[in-house]
């Protein structure tokens, strides 16, 4: 099964920020929700193929098959091509990828909780 091959971290600042955005149906730069350096992020959800996740990470994050973690999404943050964090977060963010300019914005506002997606301003 697609259980994590590594211990997935947890970032209270990221979780709290995502929760606030979802609760208030507002957006923010993802970089403002983190306190570590990164230049690219990948977000994966339950059921995403292990091969895609491991390829994006450049290392084995998920054993095989598909990512299996109930109500969790996986954030992989990289800096200069190397993974600096692999974090679990509430499954309120749609899968996607972006750089430090990417914003987290409401994807839908009803029903609650609000789901979020990665978007670029003016693109």
PLM feature spans:
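Long, low-complexity intrinsically disordered regions enriched in Ser/Thr/Pro/Gly
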Residues: 15, 27, 35, 109-113, ...
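Mature extracytoplasmic domains of secretory-pathway proteins
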Residues: 22-88, 92
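Extended hydrophobic/Leu-rich segments
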Residues: 8, 30, 53, 116-119
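C-terminal partner/receptor-binding element of secreted or periplasmic proteins
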Residues: 92-123
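N-terminal, charge-rich interaction modules
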Residues: 2-33
């Amino acid at each position: 099964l697609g259980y994590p091959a590594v211990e997935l971290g947890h970032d209270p600042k990221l979780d709290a920020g995502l929760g606030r955005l979802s609760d208030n149906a507002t957006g923010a730069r993802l970089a403002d929700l983190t306190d570590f350096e990164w230049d690219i992020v990948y977000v994966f959800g339950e059921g995403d193929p292990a091969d895609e996740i491991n390829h994006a990470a450049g290392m084995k994050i998920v054993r095989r098959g598909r990512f299996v973690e109930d109500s969790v999404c996986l954030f992989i943050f990289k800096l200069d091509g190397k993974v600096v964090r692999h974090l679990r977060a509430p499954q309120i963010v749609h899968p996607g990828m972006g750089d430090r300019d990417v914003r987290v914005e409401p994807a839908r506002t009803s029903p609650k909780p609000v789901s979020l997606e990665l978007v670029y301003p003016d693109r």
